[in-house]
Amino acid sequence: MVSAKKTVLITGCSEGGMGAALAVAFKEAGFRVYATARDPSKMASLSRAGIETLTLDILSSESIATCASSVSSLDILVNNAGSSYSMPVADMDINYAKQLFDVNVWAQLAVSQAFLPHLIKSKGMISAYNASKAAISMFSDCQRLELEPFGVKVIDLKTGAVASNLIKNQKTLTPITLPRDSIYEPARDAVEAAMRNDKMADVGTPANQWAKEVVGDLTRKSPPLVIWRGANAKLGRFGTIMPHGMMDSTIKKMTGLDVVEQKVRVA
């Protein structure tokens, strides 16, 4: 059992998500947990479970500063909050893509900066959930080297498919239809199915199982610099050591892009 004095703050803890699952898993491991979200009403079940909840809009510097000032000490920061956007590059709304980058990259770094004084004092840890956030993965490598002299560990959390509200929220908050003039018109149905992640919706690791595994990894005496958890995460890890492009056919079959390719070619 981890000492109750250890504290963790997790961003993006709305109910049904991976952040909420992490909050529960950390509490069960003996941590004092600060669960945060932009809308505190979406963390009601966590409050009922005895988990402390704080308001945090990661896109607001004022909100970040207020949240950081309300925490007296911190051992682990988990940058979990983020968003997703599925659209072929040819049809992508660049302004929307820039907003996504603000959420998934710059906001994460702003949160890390705000809580860094606490983490340096405790010689703590920063962990960033990384699915499609490739830029954050690169920044994690930089932070790991830069913060090592201060005793702060930086862990890159690479996650496969997890059964959570992420895909559901994506369908609600982001466009899932191609524009009328898309070059993918001959394969519209197949492309939009891939954008909705139809083939991936029911194959994810249960969020509570994923969270327990991640907490177990992070609380090891010497946690790995990169943690691979979630369905198909091992496949992603294997792909990093294979020749570039070797996994293309597997990824196409997993996502439905093989069907897209067939329809575009025969059009």
UniProtKB/Swiss-Prot annotation:
Binding site for NADP(+): I10, T36, K42, D57, N80, Y129, K133, V162, S164
GO MF term (any one): triacylglycerol lipase activity
Pathway(s) it belongs to: Secondary metabolite biosynthesis
Catalytic residues in the record: Y129 (proton acceptor), K133 (lowers pka of active site tyr)
Record's function text: Short-chain dehydrogenase/reductase; part of the gene cluster that mediates the biosynthesis of dibenzodioxocinones such as pestalotiollide B, a novel class of inhibitors against cholesterol ester transfer protein (CEPT). The biosynthesis initiates from condensation of acetate and malonate units catalyzed by the non-reducing PKS pks8/GME11356. Pks8/GME11356 lacks a thioesterase (TE) domain, which is important to the cyclizing of the third ring of atrochrysone carboxylic acid, and the esterase GME11355 might play the role of TE and catalyzes the cyclization reaction of the C ring.
Keywords annotated in UniProt: NADP, Oxidoreductase
Family: Belongs to the short-chain dehydrogenases/reductases (SDR) family.
Protein name: Short-chain dehydrogenase/reductase GME11361
GO terms under biological process: phosphatidic acid biosynthetic process; triglyceride catabolic process
PROSITE patterns attached to this UniProt entry: ADH_SHORT
InterPro entries given in the database record: NAD(P)-bd_dom_sf, Sc_DH/Rdtase_CS, SDR_fam
Signal peptide: none
Induction and repression of expression: The expression of the dibenzodioxocinones biosynthesis cluster is positively regulated by the transcription factor dibT.
EC number(s) given by UniProt: 1.1.1.-
One protein family per Pfam: adh_short
Enzyme class: oxidoreductase
Superkingdom of source: Eukaryota
GO cellular component labels: endoplasmic reticulum; lipid droplet
